[in-house]
Design a protein with these regions (language model features):
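Surface-exposed binding patches on compact interaction domains or structured appendages
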Residues: 50-57, 82-144, 230-231, 237-240
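Beta-strand-rich interaction surfaces with strong enrichment in secreted/lumenal proteins
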Residues: 60-63, 128-134, 148, 247-252, ...
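Membrane-proximal extracellular "stem/stalk" segments
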Residues: 191-301
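Cytoplasmic C-terminal tails of single-pass
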Residues: 322-330
């Protein structure tokens, strides 16, 4: 009888320990949730900087035919508090790695258009570089033309038009900050065009302890013209219902390989979802669907603690029964 009372007492103690662990776990979870969801302080609007540039549009896709001359325009807005002068000029546009770090100096067969661009100055003349002025809160329209020669390569042509503010005080002995924005010019010539895409990889993890859920892939362009690789991302609950859906396009330039990534920015701290990721590039397509688990580290620690307590309880129970059997044999 005493042994039974002792066993029941130990069992109750173990139950109290489990309840205490669960209570502490809940308190810790609420504390973490409160930290993650606490609203950021609101600050008053910052004072306008003296010099600030805004351009529109930021990209121009054009058709380039032999011996043609075409004019285009873009706007430069002074959103700062003071007037300033700025200059415009064109540079080659290319990339130097699979992460698509841009290069504005490397020249190749697909950057010749940067030499075909000239700008109309205030006197009506065209030149490789032009300077203008714009007052605070005002807009300046810039006109440029592309003069296409008779002998042009087939496929795509890429350049960037820079708008660079000219500081009023040029202190050569100090640090000079330059404000510069760019407008991408993507051209397609009327020569022979070859389009070729290859999806080299398409991956998505199934388990996350922190961070944002993402899917990534690698696309190769073996042609002579750019194309748009489309990433699609669909997140569903296990028992149905779409939680999140997104689609994004990525330019892939000729003779390059690009690593691309799509991220679920509002990934929750905990959950289990069915996620479908699809990558399309010209006539190539890959799709994968996975069950993805998101579980933070502190919850893993709690589960391990509960598992340890459960195992300890079974060990105590097993030893108790073994001891009882031994006494009965004696």
């Amino acid at each position: 009888m005493l042994e039974r009372i002792s066993f029941i007492s130990k069992l109750r103690q173990l139950q109290l320990i489990i309840k205490a662990v669960l209570a502490l776990s809940l308190l810790f979870s609420f504390a973490v949730f409160g930290i993650l969801t606490s609203s950021s302080p609101v600050y008053a609007d910052e004072e306008k900087p003296a010099m600030r540039i805004q351009i529109s549009p930021v990209e121009n896709r054009v058709t380039l035919n032999e011996n043609e001359v075409n004019e285009y325009t873009f706007n430069v807005d002074n959103t700062g508090s003071e007037g300033y002068s700025f200059k415009v000029y064109a540079n080659p546009y290319s990339v130097v790695n699979e992460q698509y770090s841009p290069s504005f100096s490397n020249q190749n067969a697909h950057t010749q258009v940067s030499r075909w661009i000239t700008f109309k100055n205030d006197t009506g003349e065209y030149s490789q570089e032009a300077t203008y002025s714009v007052e605070a809160g005002q807009r300046k329209e810039v006109t440029y033309k592309i003069t296409v020669p008779s002998d042009i390569p087939g496929g795509g042509q890429y350049a960037i038009v820079f708008v660079e503010a000219i500081p009023k005080d040029d202190n050569s002995g100090g640090i000079r900050t330059v404000s510069r924005l760019g407008l991408r010019v993507f051209g397609r010539t009327n020569g022979e065009t070859k389009e070729s895409a290859e999806i080299l990889s398409h991956n998505m993890d199934s388990f996350y302890m922190s961070g944002k859920i993402k899917t990534n892939g690698t696309v190769k362009n073996s042609g002579n013209a750019d194309f748009n690789a489309i990433f699609k991302f669909k997140v569903e609950k296990i028992f149905g219902g779409v939680v999140y859906e997104d689609s994004k396009g990525y330019d892939v330039l000729p003779d390059t390989t690009r690593n691309i990534e799509l991220t679920w920015d509002e990934t929750p701290a905990f959950g289990i979802y069915r996620i479908t990721s699809t990558l399309n590039a010209l006539d190539q397509s890959r799709s994968t669907t996975k069950i993805v688990l998101i579980i933070p580290v502190f919850m893993i620690v709690i589960l391990l603690m509960l598992l340890t307590i459960t195992i300890a309880w079974f060990i105590i129970l097993f030893r108790k029964r073994q001891a009882q059997k031994s006494k009965l044999i004696i």
